[in-house]
Design a protein with these regions (language model features):
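Short, Lys/Arg-enriched N-terminal segments with co-localized hydrophobic residues
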Residues: 1-17
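Positively charged, small/polar-rich N-terminal and surface patches that mediate targeting and assembly
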Residues: 7-10, 63, 136, 170-173, ...
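Core subunits and conserved enzymes of cellular information-processing
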Residues: 14-223
Length: 297
């Protein structure tokens, strides 16, 4: 009986792991395709030079020797090989997959849907999509421990062999590439590229925060059991109960502490409204919860 129960637990854990792996694979694929669309249709066609390898690709494409998509493909493949040789086991498979998918998609788009002009004659609209789509895709990848390669691989290599501040080094390289855009494509395009560079990191951070947004509940009530039962049995979350006393009434109270995602938060709020209308609820937004059911330490 114990053996059967153990096998059952192993099967359940295996299925959960497969579901998580498939979900991560789907998210990596979707996020990388979003980045490719934003880069090809809005960044390459407008000659925006912000952001790493693709920004450098726009500059190189101006020479006419190679297209931006092909340069990105070749450079990313070389960086992948270099990363595999130097980093070995530290080289993450997720990064390799996303980098290859991004490079291949850009090359395919160039051949299937060649573009010589932007979609619109509104540069501000174009630059917003050129920033927002790749930033959103990057946020999804960073959130699941992946990246699209490029300068991230260079950063991993440099980090292994030196104590250089990688963040500052990447910012300096991005600024240098963006500034070159002023001389190659003119003041107008250069300013749009500088604008894109200045808000890209801000957008990535905000997208990540939005993806991780959860709700932290402090519920002050006289009867905690029904609420805790709902949290544990219906929402499948944990909760902590603390003894308290009302400062004005002097009556005994209980404080229930719990953290939920946004959908669960709505359900709990509606349940408390129906079950205990006199309860006092404090709800706070939090973008980082570490522990079982959320993010691992």
């Amino acid at each position: 009986m114990l053996i059967l129960r153990g096998l059952s637990n192993i099967i359940i854990l295996g299925n959960e792991q497969m579901d998580k792996s498939f979900k991560n694979f789907a998210m990596m694929t979707g996020a990388t395709l979003i980045m490719a669309v934003g880069t090809y249709f809005f960044k390459f066609t407008n000659n925006f030079t912000f952001s790493g390898i693709t920004g450098l690709a726009v500059l190189v494409a101006k020479t006419g020797l190679i297209s931006a998509a092909d340069f990105s493909f070749i450079t990313n493949m070389l960086l992948l090989v270099l990363g595999a040789v130097i980093l070995g086991k530290q080289f993450v498979a997720k990064t390799a997959y996303c980098s290859i998918l991004l490079s291949v998609t850009l090359s395919l788009l160039e051949r299937v849907y060649p573009m010589s002009h932007p979609f619109t004659d509104e540069p501000m609209l174009e630059v917003m999509f050129a920033i927002a789509l790749p930033a959103f895709g990057s946020a999804i990848l960073f959130n699941i421990g992946a990246s699209s390669g490029g300068t991230d691989i260079i950063a991993m290599i440099v980090k292994k062999y030196s104590s250089i501040n990688i963040g500052k080094a990447l910012i300096v390289s991005d600024i240098a590439i963006t500034v070159l855009g002023f001389f190659v494509f003119g003041m107008k395009t250069g300013l749009y590229s500088l604008f894109g560079l200045s808000i890209r990191s801000f957008l990535v951070d905000n997208f990540i925060e939005s993806l991780n947004l959860s709700k932290y509940f402090n519920v002050v009530c006289a009867k905690p059991d029904p609420i805790c039962d709902f949290i544990v049995n219906q929402l499948h979350r944990g909760a902590t109960i603390c003894d308290a006393r009302g400062a004005f009434s002097g009556s005994e109270k209980y404080i229930i502490l719990t953290a939920l995602n946004r959908q669960q938060a709505i359900k709990l709020r509606n349940f408390i409204k129906k079950e205990d209308p006199s309860a006092f609820i404090l709800i706070s937004n939090t973008s980082e919860i570490i522990g079982k059911g959320f993010h691992a330490i």
